[in-house]
């Protein structure tokens, strides 16, 4: 039995390594690129190899360490294949050691209209269960495994329904001033099942979240900023550049410190603040022994920027 388990483990390990190697190798073809405005065309789309990406998902690598994920919705309907493709890219972000942060944006005039495509989602709506998918991280974060690396999102136009829940799952959020938000599932005979009943309430407060979820009313980028849902509001067309600016700052910071910061905050949400408090000093002691911590002092002494390696 042990030999069978070992062989299964080896096959799974090789399968994951092959997936990462194929996808990362394709990403490397993009090289290092400079920031691009949203109305400009970046380098040609990078073929993803295995697994195949939906036609409406575009991926590029920026500066070697930033994963750019561009989605294009041809209609307000969200197909299951698009969600699975995005989830596999988030898995890549977490498991490729050279990637430090992701940026999610839209290639079209709208982010995501957010109505689930009835045909492709029929099995999920019938069984109440998401299909088991290998090398996948749920984009809205409602089931484990959860994303471990930072994600910045840039939105414009419609950011509604499932699109708003995808937006809420990001760590830092940028919106163009023309963004129209909505969480109006109650007007279509169901409810926000992609995490908004938890994340929207947590981010904006009970009354603010319920005011929009129970009525289905739209709200603006300025209102989203007032509610604390958005960290930056930009003129239309500048939201992606701002998101990349934020991502670049994250990418040069110490990866171990970034991970510990996210872990601590998430532990407080999932396990309570006492558990998060208890883990603070042990985690600090662990990071104090890291090479990145020593690199900070070396860089300080040598009067240069630190080059953190995540070790």
Give each language-model segment a name.
Residues 51, 85, 106-146, 159, ...:
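Glycine- (often His-adjacent) and acidic-residue-rich active-site loop
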Residues 1-14:
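N-terminal secretory signal peptides
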Residues 14-26:
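N-terminal export leaders
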Residues 69, 86, 104, 167, ...:
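Terminal peptide-recognition signature
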Residues 38-105, 109:
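Conserved CoA-thioester-binding segment of acyl-CoA-metabolizing enzymes
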Residues 49, 143-256, 295-298:
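Crotonase-fold acyl-CoA enzyme core
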Residues 19-22, 36-52, 298-311:
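Terminal low-complexity tails and localization/encapsulation signals of metabolic enzymes
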């Amino acid at each position: 039995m042990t030999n069978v388990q070992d062989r299964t483990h080896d096959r799974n390990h090789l399968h994951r390594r092959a997936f990462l190697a194929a996808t990362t190798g394709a990403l490397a073809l993009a090289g290092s690129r400079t920031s691009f405005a949203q109305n400009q065309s970046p380098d040609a789309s990078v073929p993803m190899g295995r697994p195949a990406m939906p036609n409406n998902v575009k991926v590029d690598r920026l500066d070697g360490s930033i994963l750019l994920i561009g989605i294009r919705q041809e209609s307000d309907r969200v197909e299951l294949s698009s969600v699975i493709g995005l989830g596999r890219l988030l898995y890549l972000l977490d498991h490729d050691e050279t990637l430090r942060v992701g940026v999610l944006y839209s290639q079209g005039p709208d982010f995501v209209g957010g109505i689930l495509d009835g045909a492709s989602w029929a099995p999920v709506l019938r069984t109440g269960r998401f299909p088991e998918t290998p090398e996948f991280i749920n984009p809205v974060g409602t089931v484990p495994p959860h994303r471990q690396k930072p994600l910045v999102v840039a939105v414009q136009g419609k950011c509604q329904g499932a699109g708003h829940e995808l937006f809420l799952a990001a760590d830092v959020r940028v919106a163009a001033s023309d963004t129209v938000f909505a969480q109006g599932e109650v007007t279509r005979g169901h409810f926000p099942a992609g995490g908004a009943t938890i994340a929207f309430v947590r981010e904006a407060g009970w009354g603010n979240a319920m005011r929009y979820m129970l009525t289905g009313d739209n709200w603006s980028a300025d209102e989203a900023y007032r509610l604390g849902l958005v960290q930056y509001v930009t003129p239309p067309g500048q939201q992606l550049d701002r998101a990349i600016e934020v991502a670049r700052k994250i990418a040069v910071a110490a990866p171990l410190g970034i991970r510990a910061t996210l872990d601590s905050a998430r532990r407080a949400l999932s396990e309570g603040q006492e558990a998060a408090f208890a883990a603070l000093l042990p985690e600090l002691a662990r990071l104090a022994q890291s090479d990145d911590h020593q690199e900070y002092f070396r860089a300080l002494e040598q009067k240069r920027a630190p080059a953190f390696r995540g070790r």
